[in-house]
Amino acid sequence: GGVDVEKKKFNLNEFLLNYALYIILGLMIIVVIIIEPGFLHPSNFIKILTHASTRGILALGVAGMIVLAGTDLSAGRILGCCAAVSASLVQATTYASRMYPEITKDLPLILPLAASILIGVAFCALNGFGVAKLNLHAFIVSLGTQTIAFGATCIYIDSQEGGAQALSSFNEKFLNFVNGSFKIGSFELPYLIIYFALSAIVMWVIWNKTTLGKNMFAIGGNKEAAAVSGVNITK
Protein backbone atom coordinates (compact mmCIF):
# COMPACT_ATOMS: atom_id res chain seq x y z
CA GLY A 1 0.00 0.00 0.00
CA GLY A 2 2.82 2.39 0.89
CA VAL A 3 4.54 1.68 -2.42
CA ASP A 4 1.33 2.47 -4.33
CA VAL A 5 0.94 5.78 -2.50
CA GLU A 6 4.53 6.73 -3.28
CA LYS A 7 4.04 5.77 -6.93
CA LYS A 8 0.84 7.83 -7.21
CA LYS A 9 2.54 10.78 -5.54
CA PHE A 10 5.49 10.52 -7.94
CA ASN A 11 3.15 10.36 -10.93
CA LEU A 12 1.30 13.44 -9.74
CA ASN A 13 4.53 15.38 -9.34
CA GLU A 14 5.69 14.26 -12.77
CA PHE A 15 2.36 15.28 -14.29
CA LEU A 16 2.51 18.73 -12.72
CA LEU A 17 6.12 19.14 -13.83
CA ASN A 18 5.42 18.14 -17.43
CA TYR A 19 2.15 20.02 -17.87
CA ALA A 20 2.61 23.05 -15.62
CA LEU A 21 2.47 25.53 -18.51
CA TYR A 22 -0.72 23.97 -19.89
CA ILE A 23 -2.35 24.02 -16.47
CA ILE A 24 -1.44 27.68 -15.92
CA LEU A 25 -2.67 28.57 -19.42
CA GLY A 26 -5.92 26.71 -18.79
CA LEU A 27 -6.48 28.58 -15.52
CA MET A 28 -5.77 31.90 -17.24
CA ILE A 29 -8.33 31.08 -19.95
CA ILE A 30 -10.93 30.18 -17.31
CA VAL A 31 -10.34 33.51 -15.54
CA VAL A 32 -10.66 35.43 -18.82
CA ILE A 33 -13.91 33.58 -19.66
CA ILE A 34 -15.35 34.49 -16.25
CA ILE A 35 -14.38 38.14 -16.68
CA GLU A 36 -15.36 38.37 -20.36
CA PRO A 37 -17.84 35.67 -21.52
CA GLY A 38 -17.56 36.98 -25.09
CA PHE A 39 -14.11 35.43 -25.20
CA LEU A 40 -15.73 32.12 -26.22
CA HIS A 41 -17.24 33.59 -29.40
CA PRO A 42 -15.86 31.79 -32.50
CA SER A 43 -14.91 35.08 -34.17
CA ASN A 44 -12.61 35.84 -31.25
CA PHE A 45 -10.75 32.56 -31.70
CA ILE A 46 -10.43 33.27 -35.43
CA LYS A 47 -8.83 36.64 -34.62
CA ILE A 48 -6.44 35.07 -32.12
CA LEU A 49 -5.41 32.38 -34.61
CA THR A 50 -4.98 34.95 -37.36
CA HIS A 51 -2.64 37.11 -35.27
CA ALA A 52 -0.75 34.05 -34.05
CA SER A 53 -0.30 32.51 -37.51
CA THR A 54 2.72 34.58 -38.57
CA ARG A 55 4.45 33.87 -35.26
CA GLY A 56 3.45 30.24 -35.59
CA ILE A 57 5.15 29.91 -38.97
CA LEU A 58 8.29 31.48 -37.49
CA ALA A 59 8.03 29.13 -34.50
CA LEU A 60 7.98 26.11 -36.82
CA GLY A 61 11.39 27.12 -38.14
CA VAL A 62 12.80 27.73 -34.67
CA ALA A 63 11.36 24.39 -33.54
CA GLY A 64 13.71 22.72 -36.01
CA MET A 65 16.62 24.21 -34.10
CA ILE A 66 15.16 23.03 -30.81
CA VAL A 67 14.80 19.51 -32.24
CA LEU A 68 18.54 19.64 -32.98
CA ALA A 69 19.14 20.75 -29.36
CA GLY A 70 20.30 24.13 -30.65
CA THR A 71 19.11 27.71 -30.43
CA ASP A 72 18.55 30.58 -32.84
CA LEU A 73 18.53 34.18 -31.67
CA SER A 74 18.47 35.56 -35.21
CA ALA A 75 15.09 34.28 -36.40
CA GLY A 76 13.17 37.47 -35.58
CA ARG A 77 15.75 39.79 -37.17
CA ILE A 78 15.98 37.61 -40.28
CA LEU A 79 12.20 37.68 -40.55
CA GLY A 80 12.31 41.48 -40.29
CA CYS A 81 14.91 41.71 -43.05
CA CYS A 82 12.88 39.41 -45.32
CA ALA A 83 9.74 41.41 -44.59
CA ALA A 84 11.42 44.74 -45.38
CA VAL A 85 12.69 43.56 -48.77
CA SER A 86 9.46 41.85 -49.79
CA ALA A 87 7.34 44.78 -48.58
CA SER A 88 9.34 47.19 -50.73
CA LEU A 89 8.53 45.05 -53.77
CA VAL A 90 4.76 44.98 -53.25
CA GLN A 91 4.07 48.69 -52.70
CA ALA A 92 1.25 50.11 -54.80
CA THR A 93 2.41 51.73 -58.04
CA THR A 94 0.12 54.68 -57.26
CA TYR A 95 2.04 55.42 -54.05
CA ALA A 96 4.29 58.41 -54.77
CA SER A 97 6.80 57.62 -52.00
CA ARG A 98 7.31 53.97 -52.91
CA MET A 99 10.85 52.65 -52.60
CA TYR A 100 11.15 51.63 -56.25
CA PRO A 101 9.41 54.27 -58.40
CA GLU A 102 10.81 52.56 -61.51
CA ILE A 103 8.42 49.65 -60.88
CA THR A 104 5.33 50.79 -62.79
CA LYS A 105 3.37 47.51 -62.70
CA ASP A 106 2.57 45.16 -59.84
CA LEU A 107 5.15 42.38 -59.67
CA PRO A 108 4.05 38.72 -59.55
CA LEU A 109 3.83 37.68 -55.90
CA ILE A 110 6.30 34.88 -56.56
CA LEU A 111 9.13 37.45 -56.90
CA PRO A 112 8.93 39.04 -53.41
CA LEU A 113 8.26 35.57 -52.00
CA ALA A 114 11.37 34.21 -53.70
CA ALA A 115 13.41 37.20 -52.49
CA SER A 116 12.33 36.52 -48.89
CA ILE A 117 13.16 32.84 -49.16
CA LEU A 118 16.59 33.51 -50.66
CA ILE A 119 17.45 36.01 -47.91
CA GLY A 120 16.30 33.59 -45.23
CA VAL A 121 18.25 30.72 -46.78
CA ALA A 122 21.40 32.87 -47.01
CA PHE A 123 21.31 33.83 -43.33
CA CYS A 124 20.44 30.31 -42.21
CA ALA A 125 23.27 28.91 -44.36
CA LEU A 126 25.59 31.33 -42.57
CA ASN A 127 24.34 30.05 -39.22
CA GLY A 128 24.70 26.45 -40.33
CA PHE A 129 28.23 26.99 -41.63
CA GLY A 130 29.32 28.58 -38.36
CA VAL A 131 27.88 25.76 -36.26
CA ALA A 132 28.62 22.72 -38.45
CA LYS A 133 31.92 23.66 -40.07
CA LEU A 134 33.51 26.10 -37.63
CA ASN A 135 32.20 24.27 -34.54
CA LEU A 136 30.96 27.50 -32.97
CA HIS A 137 28.10 27.49 -30.49
CA ALA A 138 24.72 28.22 -32.09
CA PHE A 139 24.05 30.91 -29.48
CA ILE A 140 27.15 32.88 -30.50
CA VAL A 141 26.68 32.40 -34.25
CA SER A 142 23.01 33.40 -34.25
CA LEU A 143 23.76 36.37 -32.00
CA GLY A 144 26.17 37.66 -34.63
CA THR A 145 23.77 36.88 -37.48
CA GLN A 146 21.03 38.70 -35.60
CA THR A 147 23.13 41.86 -35.54
CA ILE A 148 24.04 41.52 -39.22
CA ALA A 149 20.40 41.03 -40.22
CA PHE A 150 19.27 44.02 -38.18
CA GLY A 151 22.02 46.20 -39.63
CA ALA A 152 21.19 45.09 -43.17
CA THR A 153 17.53 45.93 -42.61
CA CYS A 154 18.35 49.41 -41.29
CA ILE A 155 20.70 50.11 -44.21
CA TYR A 156 18.13 48.87 -46.71
CA ILE A 157 15.29 51.00 -45.32
CA ASP A 158 17.57 54.03 -45.00
CA SER A 159 18.57 53.70 -48.66
CA GLN A 160 15.19 55.08 -49.75
CA GLU A 161 15.16 58.37 -51.57
CA GLY A 162 14.60 61.02 -48.93
CA GLY A 163 15.86 58.81 -46.10
CA ALA A 164 14.29 56.12 -43.96
CA GLN A 165 10.51 55.93 -43.84
CA ALA A 166 7.91 53.30 -43.12
CA LEU A 167 7.15 50.83 -45.91
CA SER A 168 3.42 51.17 -46.53
CA SER A 169 0.65 51.38 -49.16
CA PHE A 170 0.75 47.86 -50.58
CA ASN A 171 -0.92 46.73 -53.78
CA GLU A 172 -4.29 44.97 -53.77
CA LYS A 173 -2.87 41.66 -54.99
CA PHE A 174 -0.63 41.41 -51.93
CA LEU A 175 -3.31 42.60 -49.51
CA ASN A 176 -5.75 39.99 -50.81
CA PHE A 177 -3.08 37.30 -50.51
CA VAL A 178 -2.37 38.21 -46.88
CA ASN A 179 -5.66 39.58 -45.55
CA GLY A 180 -8.08 37.60 -47.71
CA SER A 181 -10.23 34.76 -46.43
CA PHE A 182 -11.85 31.55 -47.60
CA LYS A 183 -15.62 31.89 -47.34
CA ILE A 184 -18.12 29.11 -46.71
CA GLY A 185 -21.53 30.71 -46.42
CA SER A 186 -21.30 33.22 -43.59
CA PHE A 187 -18.13 31.62 -42.20
CA GLU A 188 -14.78 33.15 -43.12
CA LEU A 189 -11.43 31.45 -42.60
CA PRO A 190 -8.50 33.86 -43.09
CA TYR A 191 -5.79 32.74 -45.49
CA LEU A 192 -3.13 33.27 -42.82
CA ILE A 193 -4.58 30.43 -40.75
CA ILE A 194 -4.59 28.18 -43.82
CA TYR A 195 -0.96 29.06 -44.57
CA PHE A 196 0.02 28.24 -41.01
CA ALA A 197 -1.92 24.96 -41.02
CA LEU A 198 -0.31 23.86 -44.29
CA SER A 199 3.14 24.81 -42.98
CA ALA A 200 2.53 22.84 -39.79
CA ILE A 201 1.43 19.78 -41.78
CA VAL A 202 4.53 19.96 -43.99
CA MET A 203 6.83 20.25 -40.97
CA TRP A 204 5.04 17.39 -39.20
CA VAL A 205 5.57 15.16 -42.23
CA ILE A 206 9.25 16.14 -42.45
CA TRP A 207 9.88 15.50 -38.75
CA ASN A 208 7.93 12.27 -38.46
CA LYS A 209 7.86 10.61 -41.87
CA THR A 210 11.23 11.35 -43.48
CA THR A 211 14.80 10.24 -42.92
CA LEU A 212 15.83 13.87 -42.49
CA GLY A 213 13.39 14.36 -39.63
CA LYS A 214 14.41 11.16 -37.88
CA ASN A 215 18.06 12.13 -38.22
CA MET A 216 17.28 15.54 -36.71
CA PHE A 217 15.73 13.93 -33.64
CA ALA A 218 18.65 11.51 -33.41
CA ILE A 219 21.19 14.35 -33.47
CA GLY A 220 19.19 16.36 -30.94
CA GLY A 221 18.90 13.36 -28.62
CA ASN A 222 22.55 12.33 -28.70
CA LYS A 223 24.92 13.81 -31.26
CA GLU A 224 27.72 11.31 -30.63
CA ALA A 225 25.41 8.30 -30.81
CA ALA A 226 23.90 9.61 -34.05
CA ALA A 227 27.38 9.96 -35.58
CA VAL A 228 28.29 6.40 -34.56
CA SER A 229 25.02 5.20 -36.12
CA GLY A 230 26.08 6.62 -39.47
CA VAL A 231 24.16 9.91 -39.44
CA ASN A 232 26.01 12.75 -41.18
CA ILE A 233 25.77 15.25 -38.34
CA THR A 234 27.55 17.98 -40.31
CA LYS A 235 25.21 17.78 -43.28
PLM regions: where:
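Interfacial loop-to-helix junctions that mark the boundaries of transmembrane helices
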Residues: N11-N18, S43-H51, Y100-L113, V178-L192
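Single transmembrane alpha-helix segments in multi-pass membrane proteins
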Residues: L27, V31-T94, F129-L136
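Alpha-helical transmembrane segments within multi-pass membrane transporters and channels
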Residues: T94-Q146
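Transmembrane alpha-helical segments of polytopic membrane transport and secretion proteins
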Residues: G1-A20, V31, L40
